[in-house]
Amino acid sequence: MPRKIEEIKDFLLTARRKDAKSVKIKKNKDNVKFKVRCSRYLYTLVITDKEKAEKLKQSLPPGLAVKDLK
């Protein structure tokens, strides 16, 4: 089941949860999508600023499996 997250802080809290398994990063020409897989939902955060996306990628939890798609 998909869920959309609007705030970066909420996304980081979700990524730090115990049931968060992996993060997929999808890059398009106009935005970057961060998708975190938890046990029940797939949470998606859409960022249009490339610099913010790089900062967020650096601040993801170290134990989480990160996969870059395109």
Curated annotation (Swiss-Prot):
Glycyl lysine isopeptide (Lys-Gly) (interchain with G-Cter in SUMO2) crosslink site(s): K4, K9
GO CC, any one term: presynapse
Keywords, sorted A to Z: Acetylation, Cytoplasm, Isopeptide bond, Ribonucleoprotein, Ribosomal protein, Ubl conjugation
Ion transport among keywords: no
Gene3D superfamilies: 3.30.720.90
Keyword NADP among UniProt keywords: no
Gene Ontology BP, a term: skeletal system development
Subcellular location: Cytoplasm
GO MF, one annotated term: structural constituent of ribosome
Residues that bear N6-acetyllysine: K9, K67
Domain of life of the native organism: Eukaryota
Residues that span the membrane, as ranges: none
Quaternary organization: Component of the large ribosomal subunit.
Family: Belongs to the eukaryotic ribosomal protein eL38 family.
Physiological role: Component of the large ribosomal subunit. The ribosome is a large ribonucleoprotein complex responsible for the synthesis of proteins in the cell.
Protein name per the record: Large ribosomal subunit protein eL38
The species this protein was found in: Mus musculus (Mouse)
Classification lineage: Eukaryota, Metazoa, Chordata, Craniata, Vertebrata
